[in-house]
Curated annotation (Swiss-Prot):
Lineage: Eukaryota, Fungi, Dikarya, Ascomycota, Pezizomycotina
Protein function: Probable mitochondrial mRNA stabilization factor.
UniProt organism field: Penicillium rubens (strain ATCC 28089 / DSM 1075 / NRRL 1951 / Wisconsin 54-1255)
Region of interest (Disordered), ranges: 52-86, 293-322, 528-548
Protein name: ATPase synthesis protein 25, mitochondrial
Family annotation (InterPro entries): Atp25, NT_sf
Localization of this protein: Mitochondrion inner membrane
One GO cellular component term noted in the UniProt record for this chain: mitochondrial inner membrane
Length: 692
């Protein structure tokens, strides 16, 4: 029996314990074995892997005697005094100490929690770092900003990086389960595939790979539909005590309630996808722009508070943004008070003088028939210097010039508050676009914000006029201290804010007019008004505006050209003609010809004015290669138009100028070596002779 027991005990420790059990029954004290030496520890194994032949060999008596002799006998009273609780516990009954797997947590690993945050935000940050193992955590407080509607309102965004695609999916799944179990929330993970769905997609992917390998084809693995490296976990509203208000209480028409709590969104990326998307840079720039806007508005409020006594709003067109308004009892200025301006009517405002010849009566009758719309149209058609003179000293000036007196007093009572706000916004747009030093772009943007805040319906053309005015550069002739501190980056930020608000109101901002404005804003520093005759046809040299492009401007123009070619922009014939000229002046000749070819594809006929513009632009450019391309392409197309373009009028001179650029030696050649363009030149001369 003892042999069978010893055969079952494979390891040395088990054999020793079996031997002790028999010896203790016989009454012979047997000391416990001493701790194993370093040699026995090095040869020990956690799990027995002894072969069957070795386990069948019984232990020799010499081994047992050696263990008994090597053990030192302790005193007899120590064996008796040892309590039962201190007896030896076998290794298979010993409790292992728990292994701490928590990541070291310091303040540098977790972002700073903003004020008035939900209580669970700190716990969520610790869980995402310690339990999920996300790195490079960042927190963005987007409450109060205009963000995409899919994320909700009052959003706090957390961005983290996963170590791999598998870690990405596991972390998102665990986070959703944790939010459901701990806080009873209903999170939604956009981009996370379920376990069964993932198996199905992997099975289909393997099937496609086998079919492709059998056919000898390659499988495009760029976008397999399994993972994008980016999962957005939207936890929804996390404030348990969030207040609820009626929509009508916050000025929104409709029915239902509005939750004013805080939403939490966790964006989980792989390292490559996070660097590619650069969501951190997007929101950092947005928060920085919003901070500069708050500082600018607070500075304006302080400056306007102590600017002087508030004026009356008796003219009905409101006041500058930030000015206090109150009730008044002042009488509206009558037209009879303007009779003293009759002698200077034509001299001070030439547009009115031109209209007075067709209108009966004196200057008062002329002024009475001028509406604010017609006055603004006349102001927009004036030269820049004359327009700046008519606008007076600034937004506070309403009496210094005849235009201001007519604009602020004529028919003010006949228009609604919305029409008056539209007239005022148009006036500020024209003033900024005409580069008046007193009308700043910040004031224009504040007027635009007040217009939207009042709930007025903004016409699309007026919104685009505001964007164009904000992108107008400051020329050297009218630079002031205010304009010097106003950088082009700040102008672009204001213009993008206007476009964002227009987009939120449902205005289609991807159109040819916007691209025309953007191209003009990029190319504007290269066209100065001090050089009115910079590129004439007889110069025969490229336009200096194209040559002086910097590297940053070339990169911006290249990006605009790619967007214009890829985007599906609605075609508008009027805006397309203006955009073609702008593209050519900015050096985007491929974009010019691409837009030129779209006219017949969109069912629009090209007119004689279009061909005159075509030949004139290439003649002013002064490049022989492009002039030859223009002649070889444009002249045959004239006969294919419906109706055909006849060779008469201004198009004849435009073609002749283009021929001189394509072949400057045409008139110096003899009859033996005539020019290729000589037949066309002769035809143009005959057309000129017929007209004379």
């Amino acid at each position: 029996m003892s042999r069978a027991l010893l055969r079952g005990a494979a390891c040395q420790g088990c054999r020793h314990e079996v031997l002790r059990s028999f010896v203790s029954v016989s009454g012979i004290p047997m000391p416990r074995s001493s701790p194993l030496s370093s040699r026995s520890i090095s040869n020990s194994r956690a799990f027995s892997a002894v072969t069957v032949l070795r386990s069948d060999r019984p232990p020799s008596s010499n081994q047992i005697d050696r263990h008994l002799s090597e053990s030192q006998e302790p005193p007899a009273h120590s064996e008796a005094n040892t309590p039962a609780s201190s007896q030896h516990v076998p290794w298979y009954l010993q409790e292992e100490a728990p292994i701490v797997k928590d990541r070291p947590l310091t303040e540098a690993h977790l972002p700073q929690i903003p004020d008035d945050s939900p209580e669970m935000l700190s716990t969520l940050l610790e869980y995402t770092y310690k339990d999920l193992g996300l790195d490079h955590l960042k927190l963005f407080d987007l409450r109060g900003l205009e963000i995409p509607a899919a994320l909700g309102a009052n959003v706090i965004m957390i961005i983290g990086t996963a170590r791999s695609v598998k870690h990405l999916n596991v972390s998102a799944d665990r986070l959703c389960r944790w939010l459901r179990s701990q806080y009873k929330l209903s999170p939604y993970a956009d981009g996370l595939l379920g376990r069964n769905e993932l198996k199905i997609k992997l099975r289909r992917k393997a099937k496609r790979a086998r079919a492709a390998s059998a056919a000898g084809a390659m499988v495009d693995e760029k976008d397999d539909g399994i993972t994008t490296g980016w999962i957005c976990v939207n936890a929804g509203m996390v404030d348990k005590g969030a207040t609820t208000t009626q929509l009508s209480d916050v000025g929104i028409e409709g029915f239902g309630n509005l939750d004013l709590g805080t939403s939490v969104v966790v964006q989980i990326f792989t390292e490559e996808k996070r660097a590619d998307v650069d969501l951190d840079g997007l929101w950092e720039a947005t928060l920085a722009r919003e901070g500069r806007k708050d500082i600018r508005e607070s500075t304006e409020d302080l400056s306007k508070t102590g600017a002087g006594p508030p004026r009356s709003t008796s003219d009905g067109f409101g006041s500058i943004p930030g000015q206090k308004r109150g009730f008044h009892t002042m009488r509206r200025l009558a037209l009879s008070a303007m009779n003293s301006a009759e002698p200077g009517l034509e001299a001070g405002f030439p547009g009115v003088g031109a209209s007075s010849s067709a209108l009966p009566g004196d200057a008062a009758e002329v002024a009475s028939q001028l509406t604010p719309t017609s006055l603004l149209q006349i102001l927009a058609e004036l030269p820049a210097d004359s327009a700046r003179n008519e606008l007076g000293s600034g937004p506070n000036d309403r009496q210094s010039t005849l235009f201001l007196r007519l604009f602020y007093t004529n028919h003010a009572a006949r228009f609604s508050a919305q029409e008056k706000a539209i007239f005022r916004l148009k006036l500020f747009s024209i003033a900024v676009s005409r580069q008046h030093p007193a009308y700043t772009k910040d004031t224009l943007f504040s007027t635009f914000s007040d217009f939207l805040r009042d709930g007025y319906d903004l016409p699309d053309d007026l919104g685009f006029d505001v964007v164009s005015a904000l992108l107008t550069p400051r020329t050297a002739g009218v630079v002031t201290e205010q304009s010097e501190t106003h950088s082009s980056e700040a102008d672009m930020e204001l213009a993008l804010l206007v476009l964002d608000r227009l987009s939120l109101r449902g205005v289609p901002i991807l159109n040819m007019r916007i691209f025309n404005i953007l191209y003009q804003a990029v190319c504007a520093p290269k066209t100065a008004p001090s050089k009115p005759t910079e590129s004439r046809p007889e110069e025969g040299s490229p336009s200096w505006s194209v040559v002086q492009q910097t590297e940053s401007q070339k990169q911006t123009l290249s990006r605009l050209s790619k967007i214009l070619a890829a985007a599906n922009i609605p075609f508008d014939a009027v805006d397309a003609r203006q955009l073609m000229v702008t593209l050519f002046q900015c050096g985007d000749y491929d974009g010019f010809w691409r837009l030129w070819r779209q006219f017949p594809l969109k069912g629009v006929n090209r007119t004689q004015e279009d061909y005159v513009q075509l030949f004139k632009l290439h003649a002013e450019l002064g490049e022989e290669v492009r002039a030859r391309e223009c002649l070889s392409t444009g002249v045959p197309l004239m006969n294919q138009e419906s109706p055909a373009i006849v060779l008469q009028g201004p198009i004849v001179t435009a073609i002749m100028h283009c021929i001189l650029v394509a072949d400057p030696t045409l008139q110096d050649r003899d009859e033996e070596s005539p020019s290729f363009y000589m037949p066309l030149w002769t035809e143009c001369q005959e057309a000129l002779a017929r007209e004379n």
